[in-house]
Structure formats: C-alpha cells, structure tokens
Curated annotation (Swiss-Prot):
Keywords: Cell projection, Cilium, Cytoplasm, Cytoskeleton, Flagellum, Nucleus. It comes from Mus musculus. Microtubule inner protein component of sperm flagellar doublet microtubules. InterPro entries: SPMIP9. This is Protein SPMIP9. One of its GO terms (cellular component) is sperm flagellum. Only detected after the mouse is 35 days old. Expression increases gradually from day 35 to 6 months, and remains stable after 54 days. Exclusively expressed in the epididymis and testis. Microtubule inner protein (MIP) part of the dynein-decorated doublet microtubules (DMTs) in flagella axoneme.
Length: 180
C-alpha cells in the first residue's frame, strides 16, 4: 500500500487540458491547481488567440510567385508577360475594309469573308471576336517557358482546335490546377 496515490494529496492540473472549448474556464474554489506562471499563461493565451480566434488581414501588397521575371512589381497585369502576338494591340489600327480583318486560319473566330460571317452568325459576336486573335494558331501560342505552369483550358470551339489548350491568365500570375 506504499504506492497508493491519494486523490486529496495530488490535485489534477486542469490547466494542462485547456483547449478552445475551455477558454472561459475558471478553477473552482479558493485553490488554484495550476503550476503555470502568469508570463507563461500570457504566452499561451497569445498562442491560442493567434491560432483559433485570429482573423487574417489581407496583405495590401501581395507577394507573387518567384521565378517569373514579369512578376517583380506588386501590381501586375497580364500584359506584363510581353509575349508578342499573344495579346491584341491596345491601339486601334485602321483597316482598308472589313474583309481585311479575317486573315487568320481559324474559321470559327475569323471566317473567310465578312458577308459569310454576317449571314451565319449574330452580328453582336463580330465585335467581341474582331480584336481578339484565335489563340489556337501556332503563331499566337505563348513561348513554352511563359506558358509553363498556367491553368490550361480549351480556348476555341472549332473541332480542329479542341485538343489544344491555351493559358488562361490571372491578375496575380498563373492559376495552378487544384490537383498540382
């Protein structure tokens, strides 16, 4: 009987079991069974507050992923990639005739003639596609080192280009697929 533990001699230190559902725990009675000093308790409270009850504030200057030379400034646009031919020019170029706009090989985005286009399609879509080139054509594709790591989605509805993927750009850099 020499090794019997008497409950009135050894009190249970409930503070070591304290967790988020016991934040408002107060020891009952006039005896506090804690061996934690006030400095340690303040440190533990700060850790608990930072882990479970802290609302993260968004950084006004988000850091971009390293390794991309165009991502040095905090506010980057997709035009900073600077691949020639990947983005349409910003300034308006006057053309001699409307038929001159349809010069590419993708018949979905640019048919052979404007009259055939207006006969087959809604004229509203002409203004949406006239200044944006078909990204499926080889000369419109980005360089392999630039297109690396982007979320690749089909960019053209024609059957010839359904298997090819193009990068969809995000403001803060490439959108990685959820499985990477």
């Amino acid at each position: 009987m020499a090794r019997v533990v008497r409950p009135q001699k050894n009190h249970v230190d409930l503070d070591i079991y304290q967790s988020s559902y016991m934040v408002d725990y107060k020891p009952f009675g006039k005896y506090k069974y804690s061996r934690v000093t006030p400095q340690e308790q303040a440190k533990l409270d700060a850790q608990l507050q930072s882990k479970e009850f802290y609302q993260p504030k968004p950084n006004p200057n988000p850091k971009l992923e390293e390794g991309y030379p165009a991502f040095r400034r905090p506010y980057m646009t997709a035009l900073d990639l600077g691949v020639p031919g990947f983005f349409p020019p910003q300034e308006r170029v006057t053309t001699r005739k409307d038929d001159g706009r349809f010069t590419t090989t993708c018949h979905y985005a640019y048919p052979a003639s404007l009259a055939l286009y207006l006969a087959q399609q809604d004229p509203y879509w002409l203004h949406q596609r006239a200044d944006f080139p078909c990204l499926m054509e080889p000369e419109r594709q980005p360089a392999p080192e630039v297109g690396k790591g982007y979320l690749l989605l089909p960019g053209c509805l024609c059957d010839h280009h359904q298997r090819v993927k193009v990068p969809i750009l995000n403001r803060w850099g490439p959108l990685m697929p959820f499985y990477q």
